[in-house]
UniProtKB/Swiss-Prot annotation:
EC number: 2.3.1.117
GO molecular function annotations of the record: 2,3,4,5-tetrahydropyridine-2,6-dicarboxylate N-succinyltransferase activity
GO biological process: diaminopimelate biosynthetic process; lysine biosynthetic process via diaminopimelate
Protein name as it appears in the record: 2,3,4,5-tetrahydropyridine-2,6-dicarboxylate N-succinyltransferase
One Pfam family in the UniProt entry: THDPS_N_2
This protein's record includes keyword Zinc: no
Subunit details: Homotrimer.
First-listed, main subcellular location of the protein, grouped into a coarse class: cytoplasm
Length: 285
């Protein structure tokens, strides 16, 4: 079958997903071809699960998430070779690097340190660096970004250009529920060691998260200067650290009620200051 245009791909994928209970390992023809082509386009970075408009708003292309989900119904489990000591794995998603040699790595233009795992349909842009880390299917990692040791980039997560994901960082994946958007880290962000950003939250351009900051949809993000409380999105060029919110309540035993975790914006800087100032200096109170 010849390659379909994006509009045709979307139509086939949407229809197949609406009838997904009929999709099995034996499904052939147009549906299988459309899913495989969609995943190949994701893998090559020619399409993305989410794209940013000129107004800064992100548009989620749900049909591409549907293509990823349909691939699980279409593909059987199989032995994956290549482990140390001739060990193997058991999965239905191949490695992005399956069959790659020197020519493919040079053409792709990024570094992949031994034990970096990237699943097929994830895109890694040129000049990115992958330390021993994990990038799940449908994700996008931008140019010049560092994915440090034991960091994980979840399914369909969108990581911008020149981002630093420090050691042990977790960027959550969002495939389901279908209406949920992916977790997004915009350009030039720094995410401190062991931090977690999940549940489709957005970290806007140039923001800095200190070590051990956890942000989900229900996490209070408090601007210390104004008292503003926000959820799900860190504003551009914000410097954020882990904090706690005192409770106004008293427990029955007369003691103050426990404080609850929050993320605190300790300052906001402009792009010029962000580019000229070291991360540690920004995080000092």
């Amino acid at each position: 079958m010849s390659a379909m245009d994006l509009s045709s791909l979307q139509t086939v994928i949407d229809t197949a997903f609406d009838n997904r209970d009929t999709i099995t390992l034996s499904t052939k023809g147009e549906v299988r071809d459309a899913v495989e082509q969609s995943l190949a386009l994701l893998d090559q970075g020619k399409v993305r699960v989410a794209t940013r408009g000129e107004d800064g708003q992100w548009t989620v292309h749900q049909w591409l998430k549907k293509a990823v989900l349909l691939s699980f119904r279409l593909n059987d489990m199989e032995v994956v070779k290549g482990g140390p000591g001739a060990s193997t794995w058991w999965d239905k998603v191949p490695s992005k690097f399956e069959g790659w040699g020197e020519n493919q790595f040079r053409a792709a233009g990024f570094r992949a340190v031994p034990n970096a795992v990237v699943r097929h349909s994830a895109f890694i842009a040129p000049n990115a660096i992958l330390m021993p880390s994990f990038v799940n299917l449908g994700a996008y990692v931008g140019e010049g970004t560092m994915v440090d040791t034991w960091a994980t980039v979840g399914s369909c997560a969108q990581i911008g250009r020149h981002v630093h994901l420090s050691g042990g960082v977790g960027i959550g994946g969002v495939l389901e529920p279908m209406q949920a958007g992916p977790t997004i880290i915009e350009d030039n962000c720094f995410i401190g060691a062991r931090s977690e950003v999940v549940e489709g939250c957005i970290i806007r351009e140039g923001a800095v998260l200190g070590m051990g900051v956890y942000i989900g949809k229900s996490t209070k993000i408090i601007d210390r200067a104004t008292g503003e409380v926000m959820y799900g999105e860190v504003p551009p060029y914000s410097v954020v650290v882990a904090g706690s919110m005192p409770s106004p309540n008293t427990m029955p035993n007369g003691l103050p009620a426990p404080s609850l975790y929050c993320a605190v914006i300790v300052k906001r800087v402009d792009a010029q200051t962000r580019s000229k100032t070291g991360i540690n200096e920004l995080l000092r109170d």
